[in-house]
From Swiss-Prot:
Keywords for the protein's UniProt record, in alphabetical order: Ribonucleoprotein, Ribosomal protein
Family: Belongs to the bacterial ribosomal protein bL19 family.
SUPFAM superfamilies in alphabetical order: Translation proteins SH3-like domain
Matches recorded under Pfam families: Ribosomal_L19 (PF01245)
Protein name: Large ribosomal subunit protein bL19
Gene name of this polypeptide: rplS
Organism expressing this protein natively: Mycobacterium leprae (strain TN)
Amino acid sequence: MNRLDFVDQASLRDDIPAFSPGDTINVHVKVIEGVKERIQVFKGVVIRRQGGGIRETFTVRKESYGVGVERTFPVHSPNIDHIEMVIRGDVRRAKLYYLRELRGKKAKIKEKR
């Protein structure tokens, strides 16, 4: 292993639960406004997970007042307080970009049994 691998290994978080595309999760994000800091919850469906190691990211999509909102987070970011699993989804794809065009019941993902 070279020096960068040691730095990456030290920066990895071990409190992240195992989740995959199709899962519904709550991401508790630290938001800093001036001198105040608060926790904001972003609840949605994971539509992709990409990369590996310290550079790994995931994208969460939700509908807010009829408008689709997507947010991409680094998995090992210090700005993420914690991640909660809500529902395990049963999907057959690794990237769920097709959910962008679907609305209502068609955008619903089956729960894994």
